[in-house]
Amino acid sequence: MLQGYSSVSQALLGTFFTWAMTAAGAALVFIFSSGQRRILDGSLGFAAGVMLAASYWSLLAPAVEMATSSGGFGAFAFFPVAVGFTLGAAFVYLADLLMPHLGAGEDPQTALALNLDPALVKKSDLKDPASLLFPERELSIRIDKRENGEVYQRKKLAATDFPEGAAPSGPVHGNSGQPGVSSWRRIALLILAITIHNIPEGLAVGVGFGAVEKTASATFESARNLAIGIGIQNFPEGLAVSLPLRGAGFSTWKAFWYGQLSGMVEPLAGVFGAFAVVLAEPVLPYALAFAAGAMVYVVMDDIIPEAQISGNGKLASWASILGFVVMMSLDVGLG
């Protein structure tokens, strides 16, 4: 994120920074235990606040200004922003719906739904850690989407409760506590799911740098602050992946590897976003709003619910307020 370079180069630098922050967050698995849920929930709340503020000041505000200054929409300058915002949210929603068809089970809640309670995990389950990532039964209070992917329902089932007439399906055991072949497929699906949810963040950084100097509010400082903000919120996201994996029985190094892996897609999405807006400037309002809509949907659909389900809701809420204020200050004060 150095001035004087092309938009694509800036996007690449910015998204490498956000990936590095994801890896740094995942590295905390070497320090914290899987039982320290308050730290994770507070961090997720902070990340939610940062993303919401970044979505407005770094993406939606420039999009509205571009649509207005173009003069082609008149009183309907809100239209491209509204369309782009809705399409961004729809992209993540449809990605969620696609996951069950790839074999990820019935639950499309994939981004941060790794809420494992170590006190409820049996030793026998640790023979196949990956089977805990997509359990057939609930081991703790967590978010459960209905089949249409729209309605949340909190529920707490005993580890021995199963649907009427259904028998528990046995896990596929590997050797020495390592996941079996089908379990590795589940891990791959998990990483794919989290990666899909990281695309909007990388896209937002790329679009932000691609839009520099297109309007008064689309400045290098604004794009830089957006990258910093997304990097800040990526920090707890890395921990949100690695910590539950460690609690599920994976080695510390494997938990770290899978945690940082989720951020690898951001440089690719960032470069794509920068190229897109440089080559097709008229789509800028749509692109900025698309990135904002996708980010807001991830916050509302994944991060906030996940931070609320372990009894630390107030902490997460105040942390989100703090995150919003910090990101707002970065954009307004340093923009």
Curated annotation (Swiss-Prot):
Keywords: Cell membrane, Cytoplasm, Golgi apparatus, Ion transport, Membrane, Nucleus, Transmembrane, Transmembrane helix, Transport, Zinc, Zinc transport. One of its GO terms (molecular function) is copper ion transmembrane transporter activity. Pfam families: Zip (PF02535). GO terms for biological process: zinc ion import across plasma membrane; zinc ion transmembrane transport. InterPro entries: ZIP. It is found in: Cell membrane; Nucleus; Cytoplasm; Golgi apparatus. The chain crosses the membrane at residues 12-32, 44-64, 72-92, 187-207, 256-278, 283-300, 315-335. It catalyses: Zn(2+)(in) = Zn(2+)(out); Cu(2+)(in) = Cu(2+)(out). The keyword Lyase does not apply. It is a multi-pass membrane protein. GO terms for cellular component: cytoplasm; Golgi apparatus; membrane; nucleus; plasma membrane. The keyword Glycosyltransferase does not apply. Its main location: membrane. Zinc importer that regulates cytosolic zinc concentrations either via zinc influx from the extracellular compartment or efflux from intracellular organelles such as Golgi apparatus. May transport copper ions as well. The transport mechanism remains to be elucidated. Belongs to the ZIP transporter (TC 2.A.5) family. PANTHER family: ZINC TRANSPORTER ZIP11, ZINC/IRON TRANSPORTER. This is Zinc transporter ZIP11. It comes from Rattus norvegicus (Rat).
